[in-house]
Amino acid sequence: MPIAIHQVLATLGYGDAIGHEALGIQRVLRTAGYDSEIFVETADPRLEKCTLDYRELPSASSRDSILIHHFSIGSHASRIAYALPDRMVLVYHNITPPEYFVDVHPLLVQLCYLGRRELGLYRERCDLALGDSEFNRQELEHLGFPETGVLPVVPDFSHLSGPPNYMHAGNFDDDAVNLLFVGRTIPNKRLEDVIRWFYAYKRWFNPRSRLLFVGAQSGFERYMALLNQLVSEIGATDVHFLGHVTNEELVAYYEIADVFLCASEHEGFCVPIVEAFHMGVPVIAFAATAVPATMNGGGVLITEKDPVHVAALIDQIVTDTSLRDRIACSQDSALERLAANDFGATLLGFVERVQRTPRRPHPPVAFDFWDQVKLADQLEEIRMYRPAAYQALPKDCAEGDELTEDAEGAHRR
């Protein structure tokens, strides 16, 4: 009889890369005959039916089981997973270096720093550590994890297969050139560089153009203020911050886009790049961290961020049909190479590898561990149902939960 292979993660989000991967892993495991549930702290209401509460995980735990742990910064679920007897496969989706948040989110600086330290504690706990890109695997190896591998991201584009919703995107569906960025509004994405590229393009090449930013903005209001200040200072017009959108709206924005721009300096994978490939939008991206591997020969990689140079490149792509066709072919080929990765066979191969490997000694857990878990649960209940009492608690009691909430989206998309 197959063993149980469950997953645990802090949040199952709708439409984000980690959520897609967790659901894909579950489909593969269940098809292979394994009992497989997803345990979470929180889930998007549309996905709650796919999950169980993380506090039920201990009752499903067994020495014979395997637990796939999607590492998250400072989550209650992570700490419970650490203490359970199951064999563990850790999946690392990357933690953004804290220096990116120094000027805009001091608390997140602390949390990302602590998160990288916490990750190191799992060296002795997990039987296998997987990155969802070679860049992430190399980080794990650098941290001293003895057994590592790559579980490649094979994006599920089903969320882009529905009919487009042009209710808002229709306002931009005209003869102007639309430059698009999709992703969270967060400093490592370097949206200020994208704004400078657009400003140079609009000023020197095409005044009939606009820049569209699509992606969640919550938690980084200070960074948003800096971006708006930059737009005002340089006199840029037609810059639109559109926030989080539905899948149907996202399809519409991809359909009206002429060029996709990515200036990010730190990515563990960057799913929007391959979404743009899939939607036939030419991509210009800065060659940093995992981005070159994600592009995999598709699109246009740049190694310098000079605005005039990038603006001239945008103009070439927009005006030269032959060049645009060659870029489209390169992106289609990159997608074919990505799709050739057999995600299911790779995952099941890692499961067999863990089963064949002698069990590692379980690291010691503090004698009061479960008392601390119970206390954390009580604090969470107070926060949810008696917020005034929660606010009256000493700062060091309540601060950890606030930090975790702000950080959960910091490395998505």
Annotated model-derived regions:
Residues 252-257:
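Short alpha-helical donor nucleotide-sugar binding micro-motif in glycosyltransferases
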Residues 273, 282-285:
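Short hydrophobic beta-strand element within catalytic cores of glycosyltransferases
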Residues 123-166:
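Donor nucleotide-sugar binding/catalytic pocket of nucleotide-sugar-dependent glycosyltransferases
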Residues 130, 170-189, 195-198, 212:
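Conserved donor-binding/catalytic core segment of Leloir-type glycosyltransferases
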Residues 224-248:
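Nucleotide-activated donor-binding/catalytic signature segment of Leloir-type glycosyltransferases, i.e.
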Residues 41-44, 208-225:
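Glycosyltransferase donor-sugar binding loop
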Residues 265:
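Aromatic "clamp/platform" in nucleotide-sugar-dependent glycosyltransferases that forms part
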Residues 300-307, 316-321:
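Conserved acidic donor-binding segment of nucleotide-sugar-dependent glycosyltransferases
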